[in-house]
């Protein structure tokens, strides 16, 4: 039976969030609604989730000693990673010492890099994936590309938001794609994955919740990426019954293997009735921001319920919905957003501004949300709203 105490008192139920971006911010808001005391940790001050947490710490989360010190001082009931770039070996140690890591320390460790999760899916679970090789040197990479064939995709094994990811169409792309992957890795230069390109009809995120009552699948989320980074998403994505059933089978297999409770973002490629596993995040997914307007319980509310052991009897989806990112480029520590009245002038629209303290280059600073009679209309409405927002540096 779940019992939640009073924040900032001896009975408080404490959650420590590792990573404080826009997704973490929404998770904190949902935990706050349930009376949970939230401690936010990230590598820079005033990160979005810190702005709505009870208190925060600035720590390099790849520094296991520093991360452990904060966790031991705060004594949280739940440790909730919101990003991949964490000292996962320390989380494994802490879990073995009795701390509760969401969903599990193993899940955060396996999904921190593409190699762990790809080998689990393809080699242990025998799930359909694109052909792939890993390489540490340019020579091995060139051989792998020759083996996989063109077109193919190269990615650092450790990166996020599409950093370092590119499509190779011929030998002319070989050197520049290698260089780009080496620049884009989260830990600097290093290992890459080379994947055969799947000529898919569309790609989806199947948001999958492991909770006290079992596993719940949300309506599939379609999305459009540029350079591996999400630009817009919509729900529900139309699929054949056979493809949907196969997507749920793949999602169940991989989330069961990772274990624990929480929401997972399972990324899949779909062509006709065929489905291929791509990646999984053991946490809310950026494409799932659409659920802030498309469902009675957003992915963030569902994650909070699952973490706390609360039931999820039903999730109601409100019909065709879409999200479109606000993605300016510039430099500022005092960004402002104008023309919001025009952006919100149509019915069934909403805006989330993330409150990121600075921008240096191109950065996702907010998202516009919309519902309408069709997916096409919802996408167009969300895009109109996003384009109406004026970003001032």
Curated annotation (Swiss-Prot):
Entry-linked InterPro entries: ATP-grasp, ATP-grasp_carboxylate-amine, ATP_grasp_subdomain_1, PreATP-grasp_dom_sf, PurT, PurT/PurK_preATP-grasp, PurT_C
- Catalytic activity as recorded in UniProt: N(1)-(5-phospho-beta-D-ribosyl)glycinamide + formate + ATP = N(2)-formyl-N(1)-(5-phospho-beta-D-ribosyl)glycinamide + ADP + phosphate + H(+)
Provide the binding site for ATP: 114, 155, 160-165, 195-198, 203
- According to its UniProt record, what is one Pfam family this protein matches? ATP-grasp
Q: Where does Mg(2+) bind?
A: 267, 279
Q: Cite the GO molecular-function annotations of the record.
A: ATP binding; magnesium ion binding; phosphoribosylglycinamide formyltransferase 2 activity; phosphoribosylglycinamide formyltransferase activity
Q: Which UniProt keywords apply?
A: ATP-binding, Ligase, Magnesium, Metal-binding, Nucleotide-binding, Purine biosynthesis
- Read off the PANTHER family from this record: FORMATE-DEPENDENT PHOSPHORIBOSYLGLYCINAMIDE FORMYLTRANSFERASE
Could you tell me what this protein is called? Formate-dependent phosphoribosylglycinamide formyltransferase
Q: What is the lineage of its organism?
A: Bacteria, Pseudomonadati, Pseudomonadota, Gammaproteobacteria, Pseudomonadales
Which gene does this sequence derive from? purT
């Amino acid at each position: 039976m779940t019992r939640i105490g009073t924040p900032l008192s001896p009975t408080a139920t404490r959650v420590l969030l590792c990573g404080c971006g826009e997704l973490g911010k929404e998770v904190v808001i949902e935990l706050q609604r349930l009376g949970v005391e939230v401690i936010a940790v990230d590598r820079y001050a005033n990160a979005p989730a810190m702005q709505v947490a009870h208190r925060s710490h600035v720590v390099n989360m790849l520094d296991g000693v520093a991360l452990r010190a904060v966790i031991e001082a705060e004594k949280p009931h739940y440790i909730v990673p919101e990003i991949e770039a964490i000292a996962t070996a320390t989380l494994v140690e802490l879990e073995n010492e009795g701390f509760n890591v969401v969903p599990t320390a193993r899940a955060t460790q396996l999904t921190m890099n593409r190699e762990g999760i790809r080998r689990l899916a393809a080699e242990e679970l025998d799930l359909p994936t694109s052909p792939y090789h890993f390489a540490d040197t340019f020579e091995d990479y060139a051989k792998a590309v020759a083996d996989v064939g063109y077109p193919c995709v190269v990615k650092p094994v450790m990166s996020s938001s599409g950093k370092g990811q590119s499509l190779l169409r011929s030998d002319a792309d070989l050197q520049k794609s290698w260089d780009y992957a080496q620049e884009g890795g989260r830990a600097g230069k290093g290992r890459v994955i080379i994947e055969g390109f799947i000529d898919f009809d569309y790609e989806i995120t199947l948001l999958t919740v492991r909770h006290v009552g079992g596993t719940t699948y949300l309506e599939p989320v379609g999305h459009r990426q540029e350079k591996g980074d999400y630009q817009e998403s919509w729900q529900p994505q139309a699929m054949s019954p056979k493809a949907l059933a196969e997507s749920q089978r793949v999602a169940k297999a991989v989330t069961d293997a990772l274990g624990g409770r929480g929401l997972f973002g399972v990324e899949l490629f779909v062509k006709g009735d065929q489905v291929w596993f791509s990646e999984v995040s053991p946490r809310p997914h950026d494409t799932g921001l659409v659920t802030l307007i498309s469902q009675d319980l957003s992915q963030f509310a569902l994650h909070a319920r699952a973490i706390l052991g609360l039931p999820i009897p039903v999730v109601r989806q409100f019909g065709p919905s879409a999200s479109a990112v606000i993605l300016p480029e510039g430099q500022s520590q005092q960004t402002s957003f104008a023309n919001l009245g025009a952006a919100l002038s149509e019915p069934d629209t909403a805006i989330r501004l993330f409150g990121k303290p600075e921008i240096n280059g191109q950065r996702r600073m907010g998202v516009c949300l919309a519902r309408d009679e069709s997916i096409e209309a919802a996408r167009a409405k969300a895009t109109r709203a996003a384009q109406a927002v004026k970003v001032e540096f």
